[in-house]
Amino acid sequence: MTYTEIKERKEKRYYYRVKSIRKGEKIEKQRVYLGANLNKQQLRDLEKKADEKLTGKIEEKSAKEKVIEKQEKTGKKTTFGISKEKNFSEWYTEIVKKAELGDLRYNVKGFLVFQPWSVMAMEKMYDYLEEVLQKKGHSPYWFPTVIPEENFMKEASHVKGFSPDVFWLKEIGGEKLALRPTSETAFYQMFALWIRSYKDLPFKTYQRANVFRYETKATRPFLRSREFYWIEAHCAHATQEDAMKQVHEDMETTKEVLHDIYGLPFIFFERPSWDKFPGAYRTFAADVLNPDGKVVQQPSTHFLNENFAKAFNVKFKDKDEKEKYCHITCYGPAISRIFASVIAVHGDDKGLRFPWKIAPIQVIIVPITNETLIINEAKKIKDELQENRISCKIDDSEARPGEKFYFWEMKGVPLRIELGKKEIQEKKLTIYRRDTDNKEKIPRGKLLEFIETASKEINKNLIKQADSLFKNKIIDTGTKQELKEIIDAGKIARCGFCSTEKDGEKCAEIVEKEINAEVRGTKLEKEKPQGKTSRCIICNKPAKHVVYIAKSY
């Protein structure tokens, strides 16, 4: 007798094809798992296939089938297995959940609960950036979260640019206060009190902070939300030349940290005049390309010239006792958004992959069994690693070794040490590298030496892979049709453009409406329009600039 059995768990229906066979006085049942929440057609098709199996001897389920069935029953995946290339949106959403990076179930729309695995990584990201900023002369400050309305009103273009995004608190004591969307109007209010002489310059500050913006676009965890975590640096200078040197220093900082430590490839663009930071004279921003073909704006640095200095009366006396306005710059690396790029750029179909220096845990130690001998050796290894400032953990849970392997691979831990009786007897360790997906055995006494070498190789390898993918995504074009094809293929188009000043904005609007993309800007090293880039991609006038066009978040 063959029939379909249905079991309900946690609002899901699980289907099994069952064959009952009488053997003497006993009845044996053979089962084939069909799946969960199937429609009628799916059920019929799977029943037919199952019946073919049940007519003969049922083979033992493969390890993969067992894992999948267990995942369906428990709702908890021990392995990941979603194609990042084919379905990046699903991949990203699921890895945030399964790797326990953030929880969206907080009951205010657009706000995310940051979970330990993401916080541990972002704390390290903060530390590296702050270390570089302090080495370059920036002093840390903590400013209030609220900014009075009168501060906002002092710089007209800044007010116009940010007003729609501001969270306003109810009037307190007759004063209207905003939750900071950014802190120019807070810092420069104080700069006017602190700066007196040319001897005070350059005046270089920064703070780590959370900021609030009422995003009207669809929010995505870490990528776009109504509260995010960042560093903002604000500096005052005596001359334009000094201010522009600071802008270039900010770009160097971005390369030193984002590329060389976090492993993210990017291009710094000067934004066109219609896309500048509100109140800025010039805006420069780093764009990182996600696997879905959209660019993410990462750190931006802005030359504000004297605009804010005049609005807030930020002045200094030069050597001749003449009073002058300061030239101000600001720089904003959004840590939570950069973390989104780390997830997207380095992850693969198995889950996360972390660069060594920012991994929440750098080494996971997996005892093959929880016997005292093995656990004691695992503890010795853990102590040795921690003494050498390597973050590590022992997974002595009751899960099977295979499940532990899958789980920590999904979490992106760079190195795994597998420890069983055989390893102890041979005085060797089995090491798995997440970046290469390879295992090797090493002598127990060579562990620290191995990790020192591997940690450098892991970063180099991830950077090399990311750089290669990014480089191959930039395509030259000279026609609108070709431009559309490049953008639809998830790549960045390099093309000629008539102007990046206000007279080019109409062509940029056509790019948005017809191509569903944006003019991201020009490279810092000015490129000469020639060949395919010699004429404007939209109006066909002689091109003044070579620009880059892409979809964005």
Residue ranges and their predicted role:
Residues 1-70:
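Conserved glycine(s) in the ABC-transporter nucleotide-binding domain "signature"
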Residues 69-553:
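NTP/phosphate- and nucleic-acid-binding module
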